[in-house]
Amino acid sequence: MTRSRVGFGKMPAMPPTRAHGKLCYVEIPAVDVARSAAFYRDVFGWGIRQRGDGRTAFDDTVGEVSGAWVTGRPPSPEPGLLLYVMVDSVADTVDAVVAHGGEIVQPIGSDAPEVTARFRDPGGNVIGLYQDPS
């Protein structure tokens, strides 16, 4: 299966990288799967799809990481293992997070000189935002 990579401009469709140690799949706890899927689609542009078993799944914008929302598992409301999503602009993404029902729990500037922020998604999970400084 090939996926197109987007985000830094259109690139030719190519298969995802397969390498030992690569982060490849994420399960995100959710109370309302449809609401969580819409949140990540609208904020980050993730592709949303139905898997063969009927579960709602996602693919990131560059076709390198996929995953699904899971019910019956408590959210991660406090950072333990903390995932960061790379974005073009943390400031713009903070606005999108709030506009789509998320909550900012660590504002921009707390990790200076890194450009980061943390938010709580509709399922109660805390996730980080990261902007490449270059």
Identify the residue ranges that each predicted region occupies:
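N-terminal beta-strand motif that seeds the catalytic metal site of vicinal oxygen chelate
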Residues: R3-A37, E64-V65, L81-L83, P133-S134
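A short alpha-helix capping/helix-coil boundary motif
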Residues: P15-R18, T71-P75, A99
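Vicinal oxygen chelate
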Residues: V33, Y84-V126
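Catalytic core of tubulin tyrosine ligase-like
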Residues: Y40
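Short secondary-structure junctions
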Residues: G45-R51, E103-I108
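Conserved short beta-strand elements that form part of the metal-binding/catalytic scaffold
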Residues: W46-G80, V126-D132
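A beta-strand edge to alpha-helix "cap/lid" segment located at domain peripheries
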Residues: A99, Q131-S134
